[in-house]
Amino acid sequence: MRAKRVRSRRELKAFIDLAPELAARRGDTDHYVPLFTSDIAQWHSHSGWFNEDVELWLIVDESGAPVARTICHSSPELAAKIAASDRPARATSDDVMPSNTTDTTDPAGEASLGRPSTLFFGALEAADAEALDHLIAHIGFRADQLGARRVFGPVSPLPNVTGGMLTAGTDRPGFFDTAWNPAFYADSFHAAGFASWGPAQTWEVEVGSIPAARATAVTEAEWEASGLRRRRISRFGLPAFVRRLLPTLNAAFAQLPYYTQISTAQLKSQMQGLTALMDPELIIDIAGIKDSSETPSRCFALVIPDPLPVLRRHGGRLGPSAILDLLVHRHELRDAVLIIQGTDPDFQGRGILSMAIRDLNSALCAKGYRRLRVTFIAEDNPASAAVFERSGGEPMHSLSFFDRHLDGRRR
């Protein structure tokens, strides 16, 4: 097996198509989570919101057929964040939140990442443990070439987009905006000397099991008594909601050791297709009773019907046919995904999140959803997990990042 840098459109197509092909070969089609192909194409062309160069790599077998893939990239901001603490800091309680041979014929390409202190990897796919072992060896080889002292991932391309690797619960399917991988991935990384970093869990709440007290909508009198109001979101009002949540989002997550500030361009990219998919009743935007329509949210929860069945059918391509598919089948999507929630640090500890989740649970019940799934809650943030535990939820997957110091130090 050997590593091959993706350079042509044909190789880019092979990189993109490898994920659904391997999932079908392994019998994991109903478990895997495709990345948006538009994101992968932008990484390859060095366009889009992510400012750093991204290298796309394939591991190919003796016949030249791809058997594994990854991206390698740098991020000075993320490298500085994780270097600041060898032990992940506690998240705030109101916040949720991912070959020995190489093709080196292009010296300019080899220097494209400069000399990063940390080499990040992501978008992992591997046919089996042998292919993954070659891929891990190549990631280390590439880090040595670039002079990186640390290797960290998976992040695609940042933890605030998609990050982490499942270490338990791989028998459960993945869902939108989170990671899924076969069980052998974590075993291979541990065997290669990587240490787990920032363990976390996803959660699942069976809507029919939510206690009545946690699924009763907040009354207008309760909102008023708390000096609050819920701003209703329409499809036409989604852009304004995105503008309001961004400052709250960045403030709420600023202390997390893996979180880098989200730009307007990044958030807009991550919201692609949301207008066609959203259920307005599941988007929570809490403001002060006297706040204007443009005042940033005091608390928010971004929840959508899980589009993964449609995205799997289209291999992660969110083109016109996929959008039409979403519109036609939107009412058949009975699982919801809480992508992100946050509370302005100035308003945390006042019970606002509990009220927001009550309204959310009430809407889930009223609209006939089967379950709510929640992305990535760090294990050192039990207060946030407790919100969903009180709603009858249970952990679904365990996951972590994987970290290796190339100078021999272990975390």
Go through each PLM region and give its residues.
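Acyl-donor binding region in acyl/amide transferases
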Residues: 82-192, 315-390
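A conserved beta-strand-loop-helix scaffold within acyl/acetyltransferase catalytic domains
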Residues: 19-62, 70-80, 109-113, 232, ...
